[in-house]
Structure formats: C-alpha cells, structure tokens
C-alpha cells in the first residue's frame, strides 16, 4: 500500500519503495528493466537511483532481461544513495556487461538542465503552478532550465525482453533452483498456471513471452545493439545540442532503461498527495555527477517548500 494514500505504488520494485517511504528501512535495493525503479520512485516520493548498467553486478538477481536488467537503490536521503551505490559497485567476471567505475568523485561542471515536457499530459501547467516555486529557487541558485517538447520515440523492448526471459529464467533456475522446482521458463509458467490465484501480477507478461516467436541469438544481439545505440544517440544529441549534462522529465521515460545510462527520481514537493517528483538522467558513466546534482537539487526543493509554506501562511 502506498504510504501517501490510496494511490498506485508503481512497478515491480514497489515493495522496496514502500518500505523506504514508510520508514521501515533507510535504504532498499531494486532492479530496473524498464521502469521498475523509476516508477515506484515517482509514485512513493523516494529517491530511486538506477546506475549505469554494468557498474553493479546482476549475478543472483532473478532476471527479466539480461539485455536491460540493472540493480539500483532507493532511499529517503540523497546522500545515502551515493554511500550505498559505492558499496555495491565492482567488476564481476560472471556478468558480461560488468565494468569498473572510472572515478569515485565527479561534480557537474554546468548548471544547465534540459527539461522535456509532455504538453498532452498537462505537464506545462504543472510547472507553472505546483512547481513554480521550485523552478524559481533553481534560478536563484544559478541553474538554467531549458524547456523542450518531449520527443516521441519507441524501442523494441517487448521483443527483446520476451526473448531474453525465456533463456535467462531457464539459466537462473538451473543454477539456483532445487530439485522439486521447475528447471525451465516453460516449466515455471506451467507451474504458475496451476496456481493462478497466487500469481496475479505479471502472469499475462509471462504468457505473452511464451507465445512470442523466438529469434536467433545473432538477430537478438543486433536488435539490442540497435536499440541501445538509438537511446544513447537520442540522449547525446539533446545534451550536445543544448550544451548540457543532464535531462529531466516529469514522468517516466525508458531512454535510460534501454540506453543503460544513469537515472534518478527526485521528490520536489510533498504539498500534494502523492508527492511530485522529477526524473533526471545523464550519459553513460556520469553516475556520481548525477548523484551530486540530486543532492544539490534536494536542498533547493526543501527551500522551495519552505518559501511556499511561508507564502501560504501570509495569505
């Protein structure tokens, strides 16, 4: 249940987000494939960080898609994000996407953020009303916010993840399953079919993956490479065009899930229920810079809320 009221909780890492938001723990772990960290961060008003894919090992994690899975961390304290993240990183020879973080310190060199706005969802009105104080405080602190329309883009996520899960789950079950448990994806789905009341969430997704025609490994590899490049090029083009390092959103976008770069949700207003958050993203490997930015913006958000409360009292 969402601690803020009768609202949706988000994706499959919602349990971690709820535990953090409710104060049951200081930090929790989750895994993002396509929104499973970011969406619960939005819905439950917590800091949810998806590192660059490959910086944190996926070994032992129940897989959905080895092409896109990325472990991350959720907290109520932005400073704790960095502490937990640095304790998780390390090269894992068993993870074919694993690589080493080059630098342990990085501060943003430019105070410019590109904010992608989906006007059809009323996001511009939200910026002009409930987030007006936050934007004003950003400017007072030297930040330049450039508003652009959210580009429309789609990826072959369903095809890739549905192909991945059949092989990935089978491999996982062979390694970690016991003798009395299914040893293949097909066996797992059949087991779930026998107990439909116990598996209400995600069953349709598993059935779709089972029914989807399989593609060759070489074709899958090419498709993954094309989609990752498409996402990274989109991000790079926007940041390069506006000479910026960070791009923000008022709702989840899957560019960083697909491209692999870091992203993080940042609660900016608790005056409404559920809280209002933004999502920030950066280029691959720019993890510590985005964590530094999130920490700085969290202080600005607190100042904006304080100013807004004073204004409400004066009225």
Question: What is the predicted role of each segment?
Answer:
Residues 1-85, 261-269, 274-279:
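Short glycine/serine-rich loop segments
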Residues 17-19, 137, 254-258:
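Hydrophobic/aromatic ligand-binding patch that stacks against planar heteroaromatic rings
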Residues 25, 82, 207-315:
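Glycine-rich, small-residue loops and helix-cap segments
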Residues 28-31, 57-58, 82, 92-98, ...:
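Acidic/polar loop patches that form or flank catalytic/metal-binding clefts of enzymes
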Residues 29-33, 52, 116-119, 150, ...:
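Active-site-proximal beta-strand/loop segments in catalytic clefts of secreted hydrolases
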Residues 47-134, 303-315:
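A short helix-breaking turn/cap at a secondary-structure junction
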Residues 76-99, 112, 121-152, 159, ...:
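Acidic-enriched catalytic cores of C-N bond-cleaving enzymes acting on peptides and small amides
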